[in-house]
């Protein structure tokens, strides 16, 4: 639940409206996030970079990805976003 709230918050901070319902199924979250990232990479690259900055996805991890296939790249970036957002929620709850 807090993970979804964090994702929605960071996307809205980046002016990329997204509103995942709190009750979203994990597979559906992954699929919708993948689609959103794919569209950002393809059509709104500057906004995509801004989103990565706001979420604070490590730049070195992004640079390690192979960008030759946008579908695979978007899936890998979506995973990094989920991982970073989960870390934020975990740290906030732990400390």
Question: Which sequence ranges carry the predicted segments?
Answer:
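Amphipathic alpha-helical binding modules
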Residues: 68-95
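A short, ordered amphipathic alpha-helix with a cationic face
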Residues: 4-6, 23-24, 35-40, 49-53
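Conserved, well-folded catalytic cores of nucleic-acid-processing
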Residues: 10-14, 36, 40, 84
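Amphipathic protein-protein interaction modules
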Residues: 40-75
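Feature detects long, helix-prone N-terminal segments enriched in hydrophobes
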Residues: 32-36, 80
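Charged, compositionally biased N-terminal leader segments and the immediate start
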Residues: 1-26
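Hydrophobic alpha-helical segments at protein termini of multi-pass membrane proteins
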Residues: 3, 8, 47-50, 68, ...
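Charged, alpha-helix-enriched surfaces in structured cytosolic catalytic cores
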Residues: 2, 24, 28, 32, ...
């Amino acid at each position: 639940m807090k993970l979804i709230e964090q994702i929605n918050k960071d996307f809205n901070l980046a002016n990329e409206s997204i509103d995942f319902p709190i009750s979203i199924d994990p597979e559906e979250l992954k699929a919708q996030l993948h689609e959103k990232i794919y569209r950002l990479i393809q059509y709104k690259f500057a906004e995509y970079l801004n989103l990565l900055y706001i979420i604070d996805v490590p730049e070195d991890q992004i640079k390690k990805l192979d960008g030759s296939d946008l579908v695979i790249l978007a899936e890998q970036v979506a995973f990094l976003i989920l991982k970073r957002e989960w870390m934020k929620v975990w740290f906030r709850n732990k400390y």
